[in-house]
UniProtKB/Swiss-Prot annotation:
The keyword Nucleotidyltransferase applies. Its EC number is 2.7.7.6. Disulfide bonds: none annotated. It comes from the Archaea. The keyword Cytoplasm applies. It comes from Methanocaldococcus jannaschii (strain ATCC 43067 / DSM 2661 / JAL-1 / JCM 10045 / NBRC 100440). Keywords: Cytoplasm, DNA-directed RNA polymerase, Nucleotidyltransferase, Transcription, Transferase. It is an enzyme of class 2 (transferase). GO terms for molecular function: DNA binding; DNA-directed RNA polymerase activity; protein dimerization activity. It is found in: Cytoplasm. One of its GO terms (biological process) is DNA-templated transcription. SUPFAM superfamilies: Insert subdomain of RNA polymerase alpha subunit (SSF56553), RBP11-like subunits of RNA polymerase (SSF55257). This is DNA-directed RNA polymerase subunit Rpo3. The gene is rpo3. DNA-dependent RNA polymerase (RNAP) catalyzes the transcription of DNA into RNA using the four ribonucleoside triphosphates as substrates.
Amino acid sequence: MITIKEKRKTRIGEEFIFSLKAPISFSNAIRRIMISEVPTFAIEDVYIYENSSSMDDEILAHRLGLIPIKGKPLLENEVITFTLEKEGPCTVYSSDLKSENGEVAFKNIPIVKLGKGQRIQIECEAIPGIGKVHAKWQPCNAVYKQIADDEVEFFVETFGQMEAEEILEEAVKILKNKAESFLQQLEMIEQ
């Protein structure tokens, strides 16, 4: 049984505290899935057409990859395309990333500072992935403490891509699918 204790917005997402009556092994499975197997969007492919800034292309691409992208992936091959075109002098922020079908979680993340006459023109694609592959797809941090023999209290801090309840629901679905798959494999062995 899950009991929600507290939920509050922070400047980088949400903090979500809930208790769960379940064995420790089950609680740890939920925690691990929340961190590393719930799919989110992150910028993976970056096409740099022009970059006269002082930042190397590789560093610029890496910075873009770590900007949280809002949304829950519905399809495995779903792609969100962003474009960025800016000329200095100015500071380029995540709000300068433009898309018809996506949105950055935070508009005030500085990407690069452009001097007079410097310019960048970029196209990038955000794709679904999981934190097990790369931390840029990690939707939250999650820890728990044991408060009784069969009860733990979770503390979850999200990074803006998804709501905390969505992450928890998705983790439970993933664990359920894994358990069902395991049972099917056991049935095949018994036959």
